[in-house]
């Protein structure tokens, strides 16, 4: 008799974190330059060797607290040794639409000949003209390099894989495969989907796919995991702002209600700004009843509640709530939320929010990991009884994401409310 499959799912924002996926800095970050970092959604180039050391420290601190940490390069290295998985990935990544008619066979043949670890690096790190040996389609490659230059990308790098939170999100007993807002990030979802589809870590687990398909054009329906928080009591918070659209929220809510996965969705209508690109950049849970927030943005959030209701069009009742967002979240959980605001005077608070002071990840109730540079906010959290474990922000933070952004929780315990 076969063993029962392990159940995967995330049932709170601050319960004990059991399993998480991360992606260490690597080749993709070595491709960042002052001339291309804006296009690749980084604010600056980074010192990659130091970033790798700092990320290793981050992973080590999670493992020391009992978290099973999966790393994306390692997962891809495993699955590309499976011919079916490799074909599935390359059929989607190496096409006339992505690399051009003249290079499709050449790039694919070269990638198929790489060692698994190197192949995984290039799937995330991208392929530049200079990477291809002249023996592969020599005439075409030479023309490409002569015209566009050796440093131009045949396949663009994916440095934002560092922020594994966004490409997929685990909501109670299932996962979403997110259609990302920016074209620069959409290939990330394809790679993560391949991992879920082919890696034994997931093929031997029990979970559902709630929404999303990397083979489909979702149009204006965009969803990113930094906006999604399953907080318990059958409630999920979803930020609606720069990166996550009402079109995606409506479809996801319908699917979750149809499967009985949640009882309500609280939508946080965010102002559209770079500083508030996701809900988790201004609001995150540190304990069952404590949140850290950037008040300048959170006070502007317009809350809506969506509930299943077959008597209404599309089977949902949608209502705007004339209360503060924090009030609404606390009431629906049945607790009085304690609030720790971004620390310091107005200048310091704006700087610390920009440096991800509110973007902490809870690894168990009352214990979070955050960046060391946010000294005012970290001090206030500690005064409120939160254990703050710090990691270096100098390099990892240049892509505008903290501990919450750099983790994709896969298994997290519920919290009783």
UniProtKB/Swiss-Prot annotation:
Main location: cytoplasm
UniProt subcellular location: Cytoplasm
Family the entry assigns: Belongs to the arginine deiminase family.
Pfam family, one: ADI
PANTHER family: ARGININE DEIMINASE (PTHR47271:SF3)
Catalytic reaction list: L-arginine + H2O = L-citrulline + NH4(+)
Top-level enzyme category: hydrolase
Listed EC numbers: 3.5.3.6
GO cellular component: cytoplasm
Superkingdom to which the source organism belongs: Bacteria
Pathway terms, separated by semicolons: Amino-acid degradation; L-arginine degradation via ADI pathway; carbamoyl phosphate from L-arginine: step 1/2
Biological processes per GO annotation: arginine catabolic process to ornithine; arginine deiminase pathway
Record's protein name: Arginine deiminase
MF annotations from Gene Ontology: arginine deiminase activity
Organism of this sequence: Pseudomonas putida (strain ATCC 47054 / DSM 6125 / CFBP 8728 / NCIMB 11950 / KT2440)
Residues forming the catalytic site: 405 (amidino-cysteine intermediate)
Keywords: Arginine metabolism, Cytoplasm, Hydrolase
